[in-house]
Amino acid sequence: LLSQALGMTTADILKHLAQLSRHQLPPDASERVDSAIEARLARELTAIAGVHDAVSSLDLPKAVVSNSRRCRVLASLATTQLEEALGDVPIFTAEQVDNPKPDPAIYRLAAHELGCPPSRCLVVEDSVAGVTAAHAAGMRVIGFVGASHIDDEQPDRLLAAGAWRILPHMRGLRALVDEWQLHLQGQDNNETAQ
């Protein structure tokens, strides 16, 4: 059940649970669950090993794209001190689109706001919903499987959803970005030659 919920909005998770149960959830269930999650994240969330160095090493335009609420994303970036590594990057959340991931709308919005064609965007995602969304938007996707909440079957699920490569540890991000950039250069050279 956790692997199915990964990357979904709280409201969508609760809808799914309601379909599996005979119990009626209270009207404020989503808000109560979000508040409990955010309180726990504030106490327990830590940065993924190597993520600060990996992000800091990339001299490329960046954005944060999440199905979480904006307040949760901002708090998580502050708690993990990733806001320092990322700098002043745009943040896109499910609140900004009618249909959250796995719909590609949020990734299309991010590409548009960055002024970058989706085909020239590289995404790092840990959820099937996120990989599905980014892939459907026409982006190249790295499936990250180095977080503590990831199970052993997640790499296969991410590849099936459209991930281009699997990243087990953030120390490998720079090499995958370099490989992707070489691929883009090859495409550019082919287009110029034609």
Q: Model regions: which residues?
A:
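Helix-loop "lid/cap" segments that line or gate small-molecule binding pockets
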Residues: T9-Q24, S76, A111, A147
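Hydrophobic alpha-helical core bundles mediating ligand binding, dimerization, or RNAP-core interactions
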Residues: L6, T10, L14, S30-E38, ...
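Active-site neighborhood of HAD-like aspartate-dependent phosphohydrolases
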Residues: L1-S3
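Asp-based, Mg2+/Mn2+-dependent phosphohydrolase catalytic module
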Residues: H52-S56, L60, R69-Q194
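Metal-dependent phosphoesterase signature
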Residues: K15-D53
